[in-house]
Curated annotation (Swiss-Prot):
Compartments where located: Cytoplasm
Name of the molecule in the record: Mlc titration factor A
Organism name: Escherichia fergusonii
InterPro entries: MetalloPept_cat_dom_sf, MtfA_enterob, MtfA_fam, MtfA_N
One MF term in the entry's GO annotations: zinc ion binding
Similarity-based family: Belongs to the MtfA family.
Lineage, top ranks: Bacteria, Pseudomonadati, Pseudomonadota, Gammaproteobacteria, Enterobacterales
The protein's role, per its UniProt record: Involved in the modulation of the activity of the glucose-phosphotransferase system (glucose-PTS). Interacts with the transcriptional repressor Mlc, preventing its interaction with DNA and leading to the modulation of expression of genes regulated by Mlc, including ptsG, which encodes the PTS system glucose-specific EIICB component. Shows zinc-dependent metallopeptidase activity.
Length: 265
């Protein structure tokens, strides 16, 4: 059990939550004890600042609250909780939900259709999630709905809309865009060769730069062994932006014989 040094001084109202149990999921398994402690502090502040709203009969409990907060704060572990400013509510459906989607075709005609969504993120509005996909985000598989939507929020801090380029120094923007588009082209080439379902990276990453940043952020934190060797230049840019190196964590967690619960490819 982790010793939480601030428990005795009543630093947060959520310290009674089952943090040790909440941390016991594969996507968080490689965090060092000091990182776990820092993440819990951020998650406590997150739950004080944000309102989790269950919808359509879904029920929250202390463990669900804790795990949701931990995943929200993982991308900002080194950036700081203020990077999650700009929204106050997280709406949670029990399963993927149906929304009305409006879009304009090449001829200027506006179409409206009902589509199934896993999650949504609005620049000045709430983040919308569903519990089934949140549960699937606990694994170290490359899929993480919460990190995906958080990445969109981080992306929009750089302007009015998500562009795939987060708030980085201006001198680094051109290089970031070059490496991101190169990754998109590489992913699309694989899709053209083997099809979407057989692609080793989620095909959604090839749709536009904003989705590429969000999808690769999922892989950055939950499957670094797939991201880093395939796109090494972009990997380094993600490490610099997030100020974290999940692949280093993964390797440090290997046993003395060089084995790991996650096999590097």
């Amino acid at each position: 059990m982790i010793k939480w040094p601030w428990k005795t001084n009543d630093a947060g109202r959520n310290m009674a939550l089952p943090w040790d149990e909440a941390l016991a999921i594969p996507v968080l398994a490689n965090l060092q004890p000091d990182e776990q402690s820092k993440l819990v502090q951020l998650a406590d502040r997150f739950l004080q600042q944000k309102r989790l709203v269950p919808l359509q009969g879904f029920e929250l409990d202390p463990l669900k609250n804790a795990r949701i907060a931990l995943l929200f704060c993982l991308p900002v572990l080194e950036l700081g909780i203020e990077w999650l400013d700009g929204f106050h509510e997280v709406l949670i459906y029990p399963a993927p939900f149906v929304v009305d989607d409006e879009w304009q075709d090449d001829f200027g005609l506006v179409h409206n259709q009902r589509v199934v969504q896993s999650g949504q993120s609005w620049q000045q509005g709430p983040i919308i999630l569903n519990w089934l996909d949140i549960q699937d985000s606990f694994d170290a598989s490359g899929f993480n709905l919460i990190i995906h939507e958080v990445a969109h929020k981080l992306d929009t801090r750089n302007g009015d809309r998500a562009s795939g380029v987060p708030l980085i120094p201006l001198r680094e923007v051109a290089g970031w865009e070059h490496d991101l588009h190169a990754a998109m082209d590489n992913i699309q080439d694989e899709i053209d060769l083997v099809g979407e379902s057989a692609a080793s990276i989620d095909a959604y990453a090839a749709t536009d730069p904003a989705e590429c940043f969000a999808v690769l952020s999922e892989y950055f934190f939950s499957a670094p062994e797939l991201f880093a060797p395939r796109f090494p230049a972009l990997w380094q840019r993600f490490c610099q932006f997030y100020q974290q190196d999940p692949l280093l964590r993964l390797r440090q967690n290997e046993d003395p014989a060089g084995n790991s619960s996650h096999q590097l490819h």
